From Swiss-Prot:
PANTHER family: RIBOSOME-RELEASING FACTOR 2, MITOCHONDRIAL, TRANSLATION ELONGATION FACTOR G-RELATED. Belongs to the TRAFAC class translation factor GTPase superfamily. Classic translation factor GTPase family. EF-G/EF-2 subfamily. One of its GO terms (biological process) is ribosome disassembly. GTP binds at residues 17-24, 81-85, 135-138. The keyword Nucleotide-binding applies. It comes from the Bacteria. InterPro entries: EFG_II, EFG_III, EFG_III/V, EFG_IV, EFG_V, EFG_V-like, EFTu-like_2, G_TR_CS. It is found in: Cytoplasm. Residues 8-283 form the tr-type G domain. This is Elongation factor G. CDD domains: EF-G, EFG_III, EFG_mtEFG1_IV, EFG_mtEFG_C, EFG_mtEFG_II. Keywords: Cytoplasm, Elongation factor, GTP-binding, Nucleotide-binding, Protein biosynthesis. Catalyzes the GTP-dependent ribosomal translocation step during translation elongation. During this step, the ribosome changes from the pre-translocational (PRE) to the post-translocational (POST) state as the newly formed A-site-bound peptidyl-tRNA and P-site-bound deacylated tRNA move to the P and E sites, respectively. Catalyzes the coordinated movement of the two tRNA molecules, the mRNA and conformational changes in the ribosome.
Length: 692
């Protein structure tokens, strides 16, 4: 089967935006116009084709980015729908990694919303060219020009309108195309599928000319040939103008802006045209960088069928019908179904059983995939998100996707004994789909602890356990791992004597217990002189102390950073035993800890908040109220970055509180930094709670 669509006629794009800007609806309309779905799915009635997990249809938000293929004007467009919620930024991050261009959807009423800032920063990081689509032009309060001003001010981008609207709110009829200088009016009867080209309405003519002039001026400032023509007063043809807009967009010098109302089916066809005209083909983007899997030498892979096969797995999904699917983007070469590939990241050979082209939730089986395309493979056993698949004789590791560390943990336990085994398996499956979700067993409590990117993230995981795997689970409150240590050097005695007829028990030790610097751990020193404690019993003393370390004297937390020296003791010829000295060691250690002013230590997190100027005071006040210490502030791209140290115990519920305090415009990252002593009043509370 030869290649059906040339590389130059392929587009891999993402649709990104704030929660309610109308992303999924826009994607739905694109699928409708490109002839893929015959009935338009409305998000409002929970039937959108892109939102195919049950939770998404209920909540009306998009969680998983389904990759969909459609055709327009003989081109092939692969669309990745991405979620707009802070807790799912991992999904956005992983989809931006594999697409070439993006359509940023903005609501004409809300303009640039908080999440748009986060997503925009992520797109800047991966240098993704963008087109802005100002949606919902028919809503009350719609303002196209304010939307453009906000893109400039808040996102520090360079928006260049290619259209201006004809009317707005309920009078929104169509648009003026500034390149062709024609008016376009949509027919309501045909659901906007047909439109008439008209002369520009007289009242808009002057404004249209101004904007066209501004468009030519901006574009020619990035193109020397056009600049000469423009300054020389020569006519610039539409084809030249389009080519220059395309180049400036690919270089991320400008962001073309168009308008419409996806829900009312207006402007979607022009959005598709703009994607073909101004978004990059796989051949327009730089070759992908990687390293040779054997020698670590840098390698490039160009978008070409003749180069060795290389692809990046960017999403694992469990499909109810075919099992585990791995979505992958082919950067170079060709792969057939049934063939073997090499997973260079894991060093394993894999067989691709079947290859599917996904359309939202319908699937078409294909025999092979070419460079520049996106498809899903069935049958990969070891591959997880971010792994490189390649030809075994040309093994390469492509730059992987960076995943943030989870910031919130809760204990989870099955409701019934029968669910116990299923819980482990199901959590394992979910963790392979989502690298920002981790599962571990707490050695101290034996509980299963799950960690993720936020409270909503974990809520949805627990929800999926029930829906997809039929496992019912109870979740606990978020937990903090406290520790204990001592603050002064003391000498303590441990004596274990039992005489009650027959053979007794006798063990007696003197210990010096002292604090060590943080991170040193436990150290045992044998300083016995003259055999007052026989050689063979000394390891038993050490063992007894080690066992006592697990349960501190204040609240039963593990004891850390402590040095114990065995200085003296005595023994009994008949009654002494290893057992007796082990108990004596443990008793002496506990006695010593009681006397050595013990304290509780808590984990301190390094918290960085990126916040717009106007919310700065609120954010700092809130961090202070959480016992936080502000370490510094700096300006960064129109926002302030506040660095602080905050106890983990005070950070629960923070993502929700921060979101409401800043209308979701602030983002934060949190990593473990060190342990430090808990203030006395807090320590008393912790002890009271444990002893409860």
């Amino acid at each position: 089967m030869a290649r059906q669509v040339s590389l130059e006629m392929t587009r891999n794009i993402g649709i990104m935006a704030h929660i309610d800007a109308g992303k999924t609806t826009t994607t739905e309309r694109i699928l409708y116009y490109t002839g893929v779905s015959h009935k338009i799915g409305e998000v409002h009635d929970g039937a959108a084709t892109m939102d195919w997990m049950e939770q998404e249809q209920e909540r009306g938000i998009t969680i998983t980015s389904a990759a969909t293929t459609c055709n327009w004007r003989d081109h092939r467009i692969n669309i990745i729908d991405t979620p707009g919620h802070v807790d799912f930024t991992i999904e956005v991050e992983r989809s931006l990694r594999v697409l070439d261009g993006a359509v940023a959807v903005f609501c004409s009423v809300g303009g640039v919303e908080p999440q748009s800032e986060t997503v925009w920063r992520q797109a800047d990081k991966y240098r993704v060219p963008r087109i802005a689509f100002i949606n919902k032009m028919d809503r009350v309060g719609a303002d196209f020009f304010r939307g453009i001003a906000m893109i400039k001010d808040r996102l520090k981008a360079n928006p260049v309108p290619l259209q201006i609207p004809i009317g707005s709110e309920e009078n929104y009829k169509g648009l003026v195309d500034l390149i062709e200088m024609k008016g376009i009016v949509f027919n309501d009867e045909s659901m906007g599928a047909t439109f008439d080209t008209i002369e520009i309405p007289a009242d808009l003519l002057e404004q249209a000319q101004e904007y066209r002039e501004a468009l030519i001026e901006e574009v020619s400032s990035h193109d020397d040939v056009l600049m000469e023509k423009y300054l020389g007063g020569e006519e610039i043809s539409n084809a030249e103008l389009k080519a220059a807009i395309r180049q400036a967009t690919l270089d991320i010098k400008i962001c073309p802006v168009i308008c419409g109302s996806a829900f009312k089916n207006k402007g979607v066809q022009h959005l598709l045209d703009a994607v073909l005209d101004y978004m990059p083909a796989p051949t327009d983007i730089p070759a992908i960088q990687g390293v040779d899997a054997n020698t670590d030498a840098p390698i490039e892979r160009h978008a070409s069928d003749s180069e060795p096969f290389a692809a990046l797995g960017f999403k694992i999904m469990t499909d109810p019908f075919v099992g585990q699917l791995c979505f992958f983007r082919v950067y170079s070469g060709v792969i057939q179904s049934g063939s073997y590939v090499y997973n260079a990241t894991k060093g394993k050979r894999e067989r691709i059983g079947r290859i599917l082209k996904m359309h939202a939730n319908k699937r078409e089986e294909i025999k092979e995939v070419y460079a520049g395309d996106i498809a899903a493979a069935v049958g990969l056993k070891y591959t997880t998100t971010g792994d490189t698949l390649c030809a075994e004789d040309h093994a390469v590791i492509l730059e992987s996707i960076e995943f943030p560390e989870p910031v919130i943990s809760i204990a989870i336990e099955p409701k019934t004994k029968a669910d116990q085994e299923k819980l482990g398996l199901s959590l394992g499956k979910l963790a392979s789909e989502d690298p920002s979700f981790r599962v571990k067993t707490d050695e101290e409590t034996g509980q299963t602890i799950i960690s993720g990117m936020g409270e909503l993230h974990l809520e949805i995981i627990v929800d999926r356990l029930f829906r997809e795997f039929k496992v019912e689970a109870n979740v606990g409150k978020p937990q903090v791992a406290y520790r204990e240590t001592i603050t002064k050097k003391v000498k303590a005695e441990g004596k274990f004597v039992r005489q009650s007829g027959g053979r007794g028990q006798f063990g007696h030790v003197w210990l010096e217990v002292e604090p060590q610097e943080a991170g040193k751990g436990y150290e045992f020193v044998d300083a016995i002189k003259g055999g007052v404690v026989p050689r063979e019993y000394i390891p038993a003393v050490d063992k007894g102390i080690k066992e006592a370390l697990d349960n501190g004297v204040m609240a039963g937390f593990p004891v850390v950073d402590i040095k114990v020296t065995l200085v003296d003791g005595s023994y009994h010829e008949v009654d002494s035993s290893e057992m007796a000295f082990k108990i004596a060691g443990s008793m002496g250690f506990k006695e010593g800890c009681q006397k050595a002013s013990p304290i509780i230590l808590e984990p301190i997190m390094s918290v960085e908040v990126v916040v717009p100027e106007e919310y700065m005071g609120d954010v700092i006040g809130d961090l202070n109220s959480r016992r936080g210490r502000i370490m510094g502030m700096e300006g960064r791209a129109g926002a302030q970055v506040v660095a602080s140290m905050v106890p983990l115990a005070q950070m629960f519920g923070y993502s929700t509180d921060l979101r409401s305090a800043t209308q979701g415009r602030a983002t934060y990252s949190m990593t473990f930094d060190h342990y430090e002593p808990v203030p006395k009043s807090v320590a008393e509370e912790i002890v009271a709670k444990v002893k409860g």
